[in-house]
């Protein structure tokens, strides 16, 4: 994997609050190598390590995108949801930002059935199928479609398992992470000081509570994916 320059600026990381970890009482000792200090009861993340692993992750996704690989970005906590959706749309990645449905990957055949149902309902709506339903039935139709849009809207064009999964907030998305491990899908995980860095293929130590920190990390990864896709288009 070729190393590239991704303009990861330490001052910008500080400004985004990437270095702020959790309280010192809420930490995983496995994170000790990534912690630089303690300040006012919280751990301070060593952002030089963050920059190193973020750069490695950018190299990985660039090379994968250049080979036409598919990505899934997962982040369902309230602070991550909007950033995940925005970043995913920009890089044309699949995403889950509301709720991870257990078995979404490990029971792919069931997920595929749900996606087909979702697509059928959307097609029916576009054709004006609602116009021929009773008011009560139309209400139920809309409710079902809205629910599917909420939980499956970000993966509606997914036709198979992703090649790489990017996860924001290891604790919140532990089920998704375990499914990736079970299936052998490579993962890139944003990890705070209460996480286990050994569970992902690439763990990026960073504040997973601040929107600015999440956005900083995702923006770098998305830029690398977009660059890789462009390289794929001009050199297929």
Swiss-Prot record:
InterPro entries in alphabetical order:
Ribosomal_uS2 (IPR001865), Ribosomal_uS2_bac/mit/plastid (IPR005706), Ribosomal_uS2_CS (IPR018130), Ribosomal_uS2_flav_dom_sf (IPR023591)
Protein's cellular compartments: Plastid
Pfam families cross-referenced by the UniProt entry = Ribosomal_S2
One MF term from GO for this chain? structural constituent of ribosome
Indicate yes or no for the key word Plastid.
yes
HAMAP family associated with the record? Ribosomal_uS2_B (MF_00291_B)
Q: Which family does it belong to?
A: Belongs to the universal ribosomal protein uS2 family.
> What is the official name of this protein in its record?
Small ribosomal subunit protein uS2c
Protein's organism: Cuscuta reflexa (Southern Asian dodder)
- List the lineage, top down: Eukaryota, Viridiplantae, Streptophyta, Embryophyta, Tracheophyta
What would be the name of the gene that encodes this protein?
A: rps2
